[in-house]
């Protein structure tokens, strides 16, 4: 895909031991760095978090404590990731609310102050939520497979209640 970029773009995703930015750790970082010339560089790292991976995370990701035991920790990868990401913009799904803050926290934890304020952040989830309707009619169509107006009068409390039921 040809993108019109002013700066390289890093499309990335993280897998973590949980959702807490302070207590949890990254166990996988995967990225595609797209250059302004359209070149692509891919990276994928399994990371030893230094803490136990909860069973539910192991089941969800397939990344187990056994898998990470001989992998590098984040500190071992941090400087090379910092160098790779320097001068780039970032994109992901739910990245503005989770992945960017988690990555920033991991960098700070190992003494690297990566300045995300100079980067554009493109969150595909935000775009999706703006492009797709997020109302009762959209939910009704998604869950019931029918248009709400075929079954109910919208914007009538009694009808909206029935549709929700």
Show which residues each predicted segment covers:
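Active-site phosphate/pyrophosphate-handling residues
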Residues: 101, 125, 162
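Acidic, divalent-metal-coordinating active-site segment for phosphoryl/phosphodiester hydrolysis
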Residues: 156-165
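Short alpha-helix plus adjacent loop in nuclease-associated cores
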Residues: 121-135
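Conserved non-catalytic scaffold segment of RNase H-like nuclease domains
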Residues: 1-118, 133-155
